[in-house]
Structure formats: structure tokens, C-alpha cells
């Protein structure tokens, strides 16, 4: 038996295309190595000994993929909604993101972010961090340990930001990114 192999039983719902939903009532979805191995009205003999969690009449739906997520912004989500973008960046975002230079702050904030993400419907995500390499690497490690499938990008900023969030030059930023890529 494979290590990451289980089934969920219930009403399975997914979109066949942009206009059509498919429902399989009282059925099984077999998950193998984090992928759907199939949907079955009866559990096939080859899967008879795997763990099955009966979800009753709850809907079983695919996980969500978030293609644009700023991890450091999670700590202050919902604030400054009345501000224009540049005002929001200058008064809220830049001062908050500067805090990620402190690894102890980054660890606390990213722990909350990763834990909440893990307990959400999001199963895959493309995530922006900050320009702080150590904090970005910390976030990557935490997400890898979480079991979520993610990609994390280090932010590069050499202009139009707060002084504490700007790299010295585009060349220095590119060099820092190359070094970061070599190390990960």
C-alpha cells in the first residue's frame, strides 16, 4: 500500500468546463500522492484496503489555486480599504513589510499565514514574499513543511518604495536574486 493513498466518500462536485458542473453522489474520490486517481461509484478492489473518510452528505470539491498571493500582506489584510493604491502602499504596506527584516517577526507572521492557508480551501499557490532573503527562505521552508504545493518569489524593488524596502540598484537586486536562487 502506498503511503499517501486514501479515499473520500460523499458527493463529489467539479466543473467539467466553464458552464457545466458534474456531481457524483455517494461516490469515492481516490487520492494518491496528492493527485486524484479517479472517481468511482464503488471502490475498486485494488483500493479495498485504503483508508476511507465518509464525508456524509458534504460536498467534496477540488482545492483552490491562488495565483497571486502576498504573504506579508496577510498580517494587515482588510486595512486601509478606503485608500487609493499608492496611499495604501506608502502608509500601510511599506511600513508593515519592512518588519520582515526581523526574522523573529517574520517567523511569527508567516506561521499564522501558513497555518491559516493550510486550513483553507487553497491547496496550491504562487506567493510573493518580500525583498528580505532570510525571511523569504523562512517562508519557503515553512510552506514546504506544511505539505502545500507552492511557489514563492522574492520581491525585487530598487525604486518607488520606502527607503527601507529598496535595494541599492537593479544590479544589486539581480545579484541578490541570483545568489538566492543558487542557495535554494
Show which residues each predicted segment covers:
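N-terminal metal-binding scaffold of metallo-dependent hydrolase/deaminase domains
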Residues: 1-47
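Metal-coordinating catalytic core of metallo-dependent amide/deamination hydrolases
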Residues: 134-184
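Alpha-helix C-terminal capping segments
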Residues: 116-120, 145
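Active-site gating loops and adjacent loop-to-helix segments of metal-dependent hydrolytic enzymes
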Residues: 77-106, 159-170
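Divalent-metal (often Zn2+) His-rich catalytic cores of metallo-beta-lactamase-fold enzymes
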Residues: 129-133
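Short acidic/polar active-site loop segments enriched in Thr and Asp
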Residues: 123-124
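Short, acidic/polar
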Residues: 102-115, 136, 170-177
Amino acid at each position: 500500500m502506498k503511503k499517501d493513498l486514501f479515499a473520500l466518500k460523499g458527493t463529489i462536485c467539479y466543473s467539467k468546463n466553464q458552464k457545466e458542473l458534474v456531481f457524483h453522489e455517494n461516490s469515492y474520490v481516490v487520492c494518491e500522492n496528492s493527485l486524484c486517481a479517479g472517481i468511482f461509484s464503488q471502490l475498486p478492489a485494488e483500493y479495498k484496503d485504503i483508508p476511507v473518510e465518509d464525508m456524509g452528505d458534504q460536498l467534496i470539491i477540488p482545492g483552490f489555486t491562488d495565483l497571486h498571493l502576498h504573504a506579508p500582506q496577510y498580517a494587515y489584510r482588510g486595512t486601509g480599504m478606503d485608500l487609493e493604491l499608492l496611499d495604501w502602499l506608502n502608509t500601510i504596506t511599506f511600513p508593515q513589510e519592512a518588519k520582515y527584516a526581523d526574522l523573529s517577526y517574520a517567523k511569527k507572521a508567516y506561521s499564522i499565514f501558513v497555518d491559516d492557508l493550510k486550513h483553507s480551501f487553497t491547496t496550491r499557490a504562487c506567493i510573493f514574499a518580500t525583498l528580505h532573503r532570510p525571511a523569504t527562505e523562512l517562508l519557503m521552508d515553512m510552506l514546504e513543511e506544511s505539505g502545500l504545493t507552492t511557489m514563492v518569489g522574492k520581491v525585487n524593488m530598487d525604486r518607488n518604495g520606502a527607503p527601507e524596502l529598496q535595494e541599492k540598484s537593479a544590479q544589486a537586486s539581480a545579484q541578490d536574486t541570483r545568489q538566492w536562487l543558487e542557495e535554494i
